[in-house]
């Protein structure tokens, strides 16, 4: 089975799962959707967006709005009841979502039957988006040890963590690589829940480190590699290129491991436009 076929089957399972849950008035979280899809929770959000043109949250919003809008066909059902039936906590939350997606109020669509029908059909279809270009190679990483500081909800403000790692390393000459691993989507919408490991590969590790620094194993193996050039703020675009490549390559599958960033330049002495970051997407061997 090709990766594109496998991924589309996973996406289909995710869509079916979300559809079923929203019909029951429930709103599953991202991890539950990824589990139902059979895709790594670390990569699911962006893979789903590339395959469908929207995020899982946007799909859930469409499904919930479609269910609520369908309820509005019945004039015996209040807007509040329609909102609760679709999984919204209040009629205000439903009204805001409807206004954002359709630029209309519940009253507007309810009194205009044609508009209501068009709204329901619109909510069934994701909005199309463009795709980026792809410049990818396959690499093999040997396993290695690193020292790391694990953070939660700190990305992208990580400078102090890396300074602490360099201080613990002692001699800058023994630093072989500056690394990072995001355990999820690094898009701004996810910063408040993102775990991110800041790490260094050293040629001569110390015997002991401060309590906030742990020794960790980078598992290595096959990976898709793209060299990102420019601001770290634009890393998501290069990550999307890697995920897009998995849809085009035959017989590759994303591993249950986080992305690996290898920061090749010092941002204090390198112009932002010239910063190089090697981005690795681990694959199942």
Regions picked out by a protein language model, each given a short descriptive name:
Residues 3-55, 71-91:
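DNA-binding recognition helix and immediately preceding turn/loop
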Residues 50, 54-58, 62, 66, ...:
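A solvent-exposed interaction/effector surface
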């Amino acid at each position: 089975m090709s990766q594109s076929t496998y991924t589309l089957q996973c996406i289909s399972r995710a869509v079916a799962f979300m559809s079923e849950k929203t019909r029951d008035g429930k709103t599953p979280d991202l991890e539950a959707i990824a589990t139902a899809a059979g895709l790594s929770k670390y990569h699911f959000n962006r893979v789903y967006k590339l395959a469908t043109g929207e995020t899982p949250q946007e799909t859930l919003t469409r499904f919930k709005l479609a269910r609520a809008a369908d309820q509005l066909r019945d004039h015996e059902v209040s807007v509040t009841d329609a909102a609760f039936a679709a999984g919204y906590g209040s009629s205000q939350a439903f009204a805001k979502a409807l206004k954002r997606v359709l630029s209309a109020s519940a009253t507007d669509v309810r009194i205009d039957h044609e508009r209501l029908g068009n709204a329901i059909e619109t909510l069934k279809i994701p909005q199309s988006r463009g795709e980026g270009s792809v410049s990818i190679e396959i690499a093999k990483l040997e396993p290695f040890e690193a020292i790391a500081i694990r953070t939660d909800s700190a990305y992208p403000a990580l400078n102090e963590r890396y300074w602490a790692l360099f201080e613990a390393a002692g001699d800058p000459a023994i630093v072989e690589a500056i690394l990072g691993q995001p355990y999820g989507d690094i898009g701004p919408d996810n910063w408040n829940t993102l775990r991110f490991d800041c790490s260094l590969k050293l040629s001569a590790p110390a015997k002991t480190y401060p309590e906030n620094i742990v020794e960790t194993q980078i598992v290595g193996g096959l990976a898709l590699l793209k060299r990102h050039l420019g601001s770290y703020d634009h890393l998501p675009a290069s990550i999307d290129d890697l995920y897009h490549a998995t849809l085009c390559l035959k017989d590759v599958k994303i591993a249950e491991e986080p992305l690996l960033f290898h920061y090749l330049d010092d941002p204090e002495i390198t112009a932002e436009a010239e910063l190089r970051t090697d981005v690795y997407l681990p694959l199942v061997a």
